[in-house]
Amino acid sequence: MGKRAAHIGLRALADLATPMAVRVAATLRVADHIAAGHRTAAEIASAAGAHADSLDRLLRHLVAVGLFTRDGQGVYGLTEFGEQLRDDHAAGKRKWLDMNSAVGRGDLGFVELAHSIRTGQPAYPVRYGTSFWEDLGSDPVLSASFDTLMSHHLELDYTGIAAKYDWAALGHVVDVGGGSGGLLSALLTAHEDLSGTVLDLQGPASAAHRRFLDTGLSGRAQVVVGSFFDPLPAGAGGYVLSAVLHDWDDLSAVAILRRCAEAAGSGGVVLVIEAVAGDEHAGTGMDLRMLTYFGGKERSLAELGELAAQAGLAVRAAHPISYVSIVEMTAL
């Protein structure tokens, strides 16, 4: 590769124009407006509440990268690639990029990544003046968007999670920080002899309650409003932490595991479900995202074992399932 080619390649790799243009288009729902028949820059701008000339410039760039088409009369259309920006597309990607959603907003914290690298602290408070969790706690709409996105993300693994482990043998499980109840619903549907509880804060707990009523699972599914930093309902066969620990620094992660260990006692099991660093699916980009959002991290099995030991637990087994693993822990 020549010097100029290498220079252009590095610039392209670091360029912010395209990622931000895509996110702005997602936030303004440009693809939906085009699909609805608004085809010129002026029409799309009117529907989206945008400045027509500026939007036209953004659209021209997204034509250049293959998301949209533009004919000689300035009429825009969607490419197959650009269809993914529609809100109703099966991939569900638009909401992740929408800068008004919890994740789209959180990703903008990458602008402050240097702070995280220098200090080891999350970048989110530097950008927004408050922590990610405090932000969600003060904004029900933002909180609901986070719960929806997380549920959609984990649904890809629900079938494998339900099939890969002998959940029925546990009798009753507590999904700690279980959000709107998607995982527990999948487990109860797959295992008719299993019952369970979702424990989470008021917003997601209310959503879980509605889900269980709607799906006819309320006879076997309970909801408890609470925090995983406080004592948990004791005596269940299993305590599930699905995509929880990577959101927290080591001290907080140990505190969460310790609460689970206390509730599980000598006869229960703690099941950590998340990507394990070192696996092919544990992305380095996601690891940086955990750092910038929360000061959290993607951990290796050895690192999870170290945290478990501090909480009075030991890793007994790990069951890989597509993009995540079920890491089984019991009392030392």
Curated annotation (Swiss-Prot):
Protein's gene: ncsB1
Pathway it belongs to? Antibiotic biosynthesis
Kind of enzyme, top EC level? transferase
Entry's transmembrane regions: none
Active site residues of this protein = H246 (proton acceptor)
Q: Give the pH dependence.
A: Optimum pH is 6.0.
| PANTHER family, per the entry | O-METHYLTRANSFERASE CICE, PUTATIVE (AFU_ORTHOLOGUE AFUA_4G14580)-RELATED
Q: Give the protein name, as stated in the record.
A: 2,7-dihydroxy-5-methyl-1-naphthoate 7-O-methyltransferase
UniProt similarity note: Belongs to the class I-like SAM-binding methyltransferase superfamily. Cation-independent O-methyltransferase family.
Extract one GO BP annotation from the record.
Answer: antibiotic biosynthetic process
Q: What is its EC number?
A: 2.1.1.303
**One Pfam entry name:** Methyltransf_2
What PROSITE patterns would the database entry show? SAM_OMT_II
InterPro entries recorded for this chain? COMT-like (IPR016461), O_MeTrfase_dom (IPR001077), Plant_O-MeTrfase_dimerisation (IPR012967), SAM-dependent_MTases_sf (IPR029063), WH-like_DNA-bd_sf (IPR036388), WH_DNA-bd_sf (IPR036390)
